[in-house]
Amino acid sequence: MLSRSLNKVVTSIKSSSIIRMSSATAAATSAPTANAANALKASKAPKKGKLQVSLKTPKGTKDWADSDMVIREAIFSTLSGLFKKHGGVTIDTPVFELREILAGKYGEDSKLIYNLEDQGGELCSLRYDLTVPFARYVAMNNIQSIKRYHIAKVYRRDQPAMTKGRMREFYQCDFDVAGTFESMVPDSECLSILVEGLTSLGIKDFKIKLNHRKILDGIFQIAGVKDEDVRKISSAVDKLDKSPWEAVKKEMTEEKGQSEETADKIGEYVKLNGSLKEIHAVLSADANITSNEKAKQGLDDIATLMKYTEAFDIDSFISFDLSLARGLDYYTGLIYEVVTSASAPPENASELKKKAKSAEDASEFVGVGSIAAGGRYDNLVNMFSEASGKKSTQIPCVGISFGVERIFSLIKQRINSSTTIKPTATQVFVMAFGGGKDWTGYLPERMKVTKQLWDAGIEAEYVYKAKANPRKQFDAAEKAGCHIAVILGKEEYLEGKLRVKRLGQEFADDDGELVSAADIVPIVQEKLSQIHEDGLNEVTRLIKGL
């Protein structure tokens, strides 16, 4: 039986420097009462030259570590693998852009852009999304056709709700297709990627809310909205996922200057939602829609799209929702957002917000919001080309964006009660057991065996100590979440033998199997293949909900 005795080691850590707060002097304490306040201030003030910092991250940001990073890396790996499968190539753009590049692209959300101080004569801002920088890149390099994916951080001065994945610094995972192709073909593939991506991450209870910018603009024309008012009315409609129609109508009439008749006409349409076939049939039977040029173009696109979504077998995930407006100014065709049951705020959200002790507390009573979104933007590249004095070039684009923080929050909620996530990718721990005055601990020998495993692509570790006791080695293996131990016994190793043992409570009484040291790599590979015959690691299994 292998030794399992526990040896406790207490390590004392001495600080190399001590920060002392200045105290009030005896003179100050004996001063008149009138000077007490000044003395108190002086006692709290840092000494000149002393650095004082707040050890915290800025509001709306956080450090990521341990099991959270394991989950996030699995999300990135899953999505990047999916993008590559669809022919995507990756690019990287600066985290900040010239302010003029971002200006006028985000409608009312432009106020959320982080502006930087003057940088040597250039006014810059942190990127708000990955779409506008991509369009700038396409225009700047005269690219005619590209499938690109980009996984990177973006920044917004939003009211954060950290536990819901609403942050000021967050990752987006984007896939975009630029170029002229058959109508609705790239659009339908982007929708298919949305479904593939979310289901591969174990998110199955979701709907893709879909609308068409031209249909929405046609509805506004039918209702009598002036062209110059379209965007602000669109931003009001976009609030229907968070506010009731009565509140949106009030905004239209009292704040946006629309008549009751116009608002009611808009309301007749934006309350419609259902399957693609259902809503397409309703709109096709509406003479006002079919006689409006813009709306008719959008309706024709939907008819084409339905053939392709059926081919990709994704119809059941899509809801044709005329209330979806998306506030960003650059969309020209299909628009879509992915929502789940967690997207909406709780029913008593407004009451909970009132009871909250602070704005930060109140922000927790919101929904996760959309977890992915996208749409077609055919004019953005040309807008940059013309503005820079280049030849006008119409490069149609369509794309999708996965919100990593919001997806992460959903996955974290789902697996919190599941098996503990392995903090590392380590599969095998190499140990050595022995004793006596001549016992060296076999540190170089452990390193040699570990190197053999590394060379075979097997994740392995060992304790960085010459004579580590058995308990400490088992503890290290348990902390790393290892499945297998390769043990160098003092006498067995001299005979060219190694012991391979499964780890875990159910194998506590199992001494393992003695094998030839020359065969250690294939034997370990065989043992690992038996642990998960489907080839999936624990994190992937948890994310997929298996």
From Swiss-Prot:
GO biological process entries: histidyl-tRNA aminoacylation; mitochondrial translation
Protein keywords: Aminoacyl-tRNA synthetase, ATP-binding, Cytoplasm, Ligase, Mitochondrion, Nucleotide-binding, Protein biosynthesis, Transit peptide
Binding site for L-histidine: 129-131, 156, 172, 176, 326, 330-331
GO molecular function: aminoacyl-tRNA ligase activity; ATP binding; histidine-tRNA ligase activity; mRNA binding; RNA binding; sequence-specific mRNA binding
Gene Ontology cellular-component annotations: cytoplasm; cytosol; mitochondrion
EC number: 6.1.1.21
Outcome of gene disruption: Lethal.
Record Gene3D superfamilies: Anticodon-binding domain, Bira Bifunctional Protein, Domain 2
Note: Present with 26800 molecules/cell in log phase SD medium.
Family under the similarity heading: Belongs to the class-II aminoacyl-tRNA synthetase family.
Function: Catalyzes the aminoacylation of histidyl-tRNA in both the cytoplasm and the mitochondrion.
Protein's UniProt name: Histidine--tRNA ligase, mitochondrial
Source organism (scientific name): Saccharomyces cerevisiae (strain ATCC 204508 / S288c) (Baker's yeast)
